[in-house]
Amino acid sequence: MERSQLYLSTIDPEAGNIARAQGLGVEIADFCTACNADELFDETNRRVLAQTRGIARRVLHGPFNELFPCAIDPLARKLAAYRYAQALELARRYGAQKLVLHGGYCPRLYFPCWYVEQSVAFWREFLAQHPGAYEICLENVMEEAPEMLLSIVRQVADPRLCLCLDVGHVNSYSGIPAIEWMAQYGPWLSHLHLHNNDASADTHSPLPRGSLPMA
């Protein structure tokens, strides 16, 4: 993989320095927690500007806590739309070429068919309400099979909505090998998250430390 395709997550406070030294991009993860876009914005903004200084290639990871596009409660769905719109504006503010958002599947709350059907409705409405050129990459977390998110982006059929494959999440939550997910995602795959674990928990371990052969 070429350096031009690699990004370091700002979860690591040294990500910006390493990315500048190695010619890499950065994935801004500071807004995964929504309060960093609200009452903690000034502090977070200073940190993000320091991390991204001099780095042209940027991706922004949006918030995900308690956000479910397929929520049964209409107010919960409105909250997801509000936070995603906020993240879209942040991506534009920081010049991020892509916005990564979790699909929002929770197996103890939603049947897969409901999740897909209602997510399609949510994203069609969201994209219609937010015109312009941008790219949203839906990331797998607890989805057990690639068909779930794949069905969503196929049905929405908007080039602004594509997929982010998180191989560590696949290893923790799916019995289907990551390489098969990648093959099925095909032309809809726009971004990857690479980290490892022993399949028992989503530990976000370094690449050589886990059961995925990535050393």
Placement of each model-derived feature along the sequence:
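Active-site acidic/histidine proton-transfer and metal-coordination neighborhood
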Residues: 70-162
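Acidic (Asp/Glu)-rich catalytic clusters
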Residues: 15-23, 40-60, 85-95, 127-131, ...
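N-terminal pre-domain/capping segments
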Residues: 1-86
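Acidic/histidine-rich catalytic cores of soluble enzymes
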Residues: 125-208
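Hydrophobic faces of well-ordered beta-strands that scaffold small-molecule active sites
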Residues: 2-10, 24-28, 58-62, 99-101, ...
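A short acidic, helix-capping loop that chelates divalent metal ions and anchors anionic groups
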Residues: 66-72, 106-111, 172-173, 200-204
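Active-site beta-loop-alpha junctions enriched in small/polar residues
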Residues: 9-13, 29-33, 63-65, 104-106, ...
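Charged helix-capping and loop-helix junction motifs
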Residues: 40-46, 76-85, 113-123, 150, ...
